Design a protein with these regions (language model features):
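Helix-to-loop junction immediately C-terminal to a conserved catalytic motif
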Residues: 29-62, 72
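Amphipathic coiled-coil/heptad-repeat helices and related helical stalk/stem segments
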Residues: 40-43, 108, 140-144, 170-174
Length: 212
């Protein structure tokens, strides 16, 4: 399908560049998910009935980037009407109106996270922690506006735990967002990524794991 080289998404990102970034990262992660490890997908057939905007995926969190990359893979496959499997060719026609909420400080750590911002990051300032230290600050209204813009534009992923540590309770901010914006909420459970990848999700830690 021809893509207008000048068209931009709701955050001003050029869609042709965005598509290229998603493809390159998808190429790398597809091999890691489906060849170095194996990934089992359950329930993706429900994606076919979702609207194109106003959907919030609420997931647990095991790595900074592998989790969200896996969801992008599943959404790309669904865009090509493939459910519960991710054929390699679906990388060539990714879903472009997907966004993920991430801590601003995480997205500034190195060139790869900065590139991943182009894939659809909605970077926000954490109100409880920064640079490894506890903080206590008010929510930035601009962050709420950006999240609202993402939801109005497409599908949005959030990790309410706000950390990759296991068994941490989700932050109340997600509940407030749901009450205010009233999106279609889709719960997601992931597993196996902590065993397979390091904390960032950029480096493989072990092979042959089952990812869910």
């Amino acid at each position: 399908m021809f893509l207008n080289p000048f068209k931009r998404d709701s955050f001003g990102y050029n869609l042709l560049i965005k598509r290229s970034v998603i493809f390159v990262f998808g190429l790398i992660t597809w091999y890691r998910f489906f060849r170095i490890n194996s990934m089992r997908i359950v329930g993706a057939d429900k994606l076919r009935d979702l609207p194109q905007q106003g959907v919030l995926f609420v997931s647990n969190h095991q790595t900074y980037f592998a989790d969200v990359s896996a969801m992008y893979q599943v959404f790309n496959a669904a865009e090509n009407k493939r459910y519960n499997s991710v054929p390699f060719l679906t990388l060539f026609r990714p879903k472009l109106n997907v966004y993920f909420i991430a801590a601003a400080e995480t997205m500034k750590k190195g060139i790869l996270p900065k590139l991943m911002q182009y894939a659809g990051s909605v970077s926000i300032k954490r109100t409880w922690r920064e640079a490894g230290k506890n903080v206590n600050r008010s929510v930035d209204p601009k962050d709420i506006e950006n999240i609202k813009r993402a939801m109005e534009s497409g599908w949005t992923i959030t990790f309410p735990q706000g950390t990759t540590r296991p068994f941490v309770k989700g932050r109340r901010g997600t509940v407030h967002l749901i009450k205010e914006l009233k999106p279609v909420v889709v719960p997601v459970v992931i597993d196996g990524f902590r065993r397979a990848f390091d904390k960032t999700g950029l480096f493989v830690k072990s092979n042959g794991n089952l990812l869910n």
